[in-house]
A protein has these predicted regions:
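Active-site helical microenvironments for divalent-metal-assisted chemistry
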Residues: 1-183
Length: 183
């Protein structure tokens, strides 16, 4: 199978912009690029259009790499860049809880394509949380906030997503959340 040009370009850009970043894990050093690739794969597996898969691969570059929406639009296209902006948390709010609360407000107004990307993102992150918990019972601190607040946030994101989109990823997110609540 040949990957579409837009998806290949997204992989190239994400590889450059995430270079040197690592995933949060108590024992293993996992290059960060593994996460955007997982998100893109999940989106492709449910038949998302190429620009949505590309935005999924690039979903963290505005938030974590200092890339602007304009720079991203020039590098790939405006539609993809707009989706990445929709799934990016506000950079100017430093407090974890306030940032998450503000993001939930913006997520409640997000497009269905952005919600699908956020769902794939959370599926990947929940899988990582479950795997990391096997190595360290104190995994919650690594993923921001304490257990109670992190779980509340994950449940709130899932609640918003399941009200607005139908996808096998939503059911997978629910299944992973059920496992995470037992950690």
């Amino acid at each position: 199978m040949k990957l579409p040009d837009k998806v290949l370009r997204a992989l190239e850009l994400a590889s450059v912009w995430h270079l040197g970043q690592k995933r949060k894990h108590p024992l293993e050093v996992i290059p960060y690029i593994a996460h955007p690739v997982q998100v893109g794969y999940l989106l492709q597996s449910v038949g998302a259009p190429d620009h949505v898969v590309a935005a999924g691969i690039l979903h963290d570059v505005i938030e974590d790499c200092g890339v602007s929406e304009n720079d991203l639009a020039r590098a790939i296209d405006q539609r993809t860049a707009r989706l990445v902006t929709e799934v990016s948390e506000p950079k100017d709010i430093k407090d974890w809880q306030k940032r998450k609360d503000a993001f939930l407000v913006s997520l409640s107004k997000a497009s269905k394509q952005a919600l699908l990307i956020k769902c794939a993102d959370h599926v990947s992150n929940l899988r990582s949380l479950i795997e990391a918990s096997k190595a360290s019972p104190d995994v919650w601190r690594m993923f921001g906030g304490d257990r109670e607040h992190k779980l509340a946030y994950e449940l709130a994101v899932h609640g918003l997503i399941k009200m607005k989109i139908k996808s096998p990823l939503v059911a997978l997110q629910a299944s992973l959340l059920a496992k995470v609540t037992k950690i």
